[in-house]
């Protein structure tokens, strides 16, 4: 079994928002790393988590599935997910899988942090 090639850094943007910087690959093997980052961010009291995909090298269908799992967990806990830094290729995948309807996608960190703090569609 391969080890996850995913690295994360967690940064508090303000009292309610945390940025999770994601570097490397996002696959099914990334689940422990990303869920751990999610748990740490929520322990810090964040209600809005912004995923920074600027350092993303590769994502496969297992990674998309893992993001859906993360989204379900966030929704159950009344937390919001947003993302920025997606390449055109991965932005298109988010659109094809309709993840962009549940995770707000922004062009950069500044716009992601300034984005709405209330979910758009339910």
Language model features with spans:
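STAS-typified acidic loop motif
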Residues: 2-36, 53-55
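Residues that form or immediately flank small-molecule/cofactor binding pockets and catalytic motifs
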Residues: 15, 88, 110
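Long, contiguous secondary-structure blocks with strong helical propensity
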Residues: 16-17, 81, 85, 117
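Short acidic-hydrophobic, aromatic-tinged amphipathic segments that line or gate anion-handling sites
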Residues: 104-108
């Amino acid at each position: 079994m391969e080890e996850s090639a995913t690295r994360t850094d967690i940064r508090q943007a303000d009292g309610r928002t945390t940025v999770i910087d994601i570097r490397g690959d996002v696959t099914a093997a990334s689940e422990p790393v990303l869920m751990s980052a999610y748990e740490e961010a929520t322990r810090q009291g964040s209600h809005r988590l912004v995923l920074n995909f600027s350092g993303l090298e590769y994502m496969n269908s297992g990674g998309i599935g893992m993001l859906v799992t993360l989204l379900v967990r966030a929704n159950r806990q009344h937390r919001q997910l947003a993302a920025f830094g997606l390449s055109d290729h991965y932005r298109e995948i988010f659109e094809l899988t309709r993840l962009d309807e549940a995770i707000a996608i922004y062009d950069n960190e500044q716009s992601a942090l300034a984005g709405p703090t209330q979910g758009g569609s339910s």
